[in-house]
Amino acid sequence: MTSVLIVEDEESLADPLAFLLRKEGFEATVVGDGPSALAEFERSGADIVLLDLMLPGMSGTDVCKQLRARSSVPVIMVTARDSEIDKVVGLELGADDYVTKPYSARELIARIRAVLRRGADNDDAGADDGVLEAGPVRMDVERHVVSVNGEPITLPLKEFDLLEYLMRNSGRVLTRGQLIDRVWGADYVGDTKTLDVHVKRLRSKIEEDPANPVHLVTVRGLGYKLEG
């Protein structure tokens, strides 16, 4: 049974959500603060964590940092603040998705399933002798070969690295900061225009209509996402 750890100090939100999750076949555990969340995760683990950003005693961002330091468990950040900066911070800390209050419990459960499914798909892709697939794109990492709809394409090293990282996180929003750190390194001192140029070049090679991309899409104010 898939286990969900709900970290939420508002019982009026947490209890009905836990009830609905159990009806849908999940195992749900509710804790109301950050230290309890970390202790429960150490004790029992979880397949996915729903993490409120505003918690008493320890913020959700601090909890996320500590979770990421010890585990790759999927995290969905739940926040009452709808600002872009909060979403960017959550994603850069390693959250897999974010939901803004008030939310539909049914929508949240759908997002939980989507995040879990993406994780399973990415694990399967990574286990297949270094072969990744997303939409029409197929990448053989070890042989450094990429094809689109079965036709080989040529990618310079940085474009290859960028596409590989996007494919390993297919369906997940990646911020510009995450992409730059991964492909150019944390000590990169340029601006984000370099990333945008590389994205434009990738689109010209993997999209049927690069001006209206459907695979490598922009998530306004956040970054980019490669659709599977």
From Swiss-Prot:
CDD domains: REC_OmpR_RegX3-like, trans_reg_C. GO terms for cellular component: cytosol; protein-DNA complex. Residues 3-116 form the Response regulatory domain. Disruption phenotype: RegX3 cannot be deleted alone. However, the deletion of the senX3-regX3 operon is possible, possibly due to the accumulation of compensatory mutations. SenX3-regX3 deletion mutant is more sensitive to phosphate limitation, showing a reduced ability to grow at lower phosphate concentrations. The M.tuberculosis operon can functionally complement the growth phenotype in M.smegmatis under phosphate-replete conditions, but not under low phosphate conditions. Induction: By phosphate-limiting growth conditions. GO terms for biological process: regulation of DNA-templated transcription. Keywords: Activator, DNA-binding, Phosphoprotein, Stress response, Transcription, Transcription regulation, Two-component regulatory system. Member of the two-component regulatory system SenX3/RegX3 involved in stress response. The system is involved in phosphate starvation response. Once phosphorylated by SenX3, activates the expression of the alkaline phosphatase phoA, the high-affinity phosphate transporter pstSCAB, phnDCE, phnF and senX3. May act as a negative regulator of NhaA. Acts by binding to a DNA motif consisting of an inverted repeat. This is Sensory transduction protein RegX3. The gene is regX3.
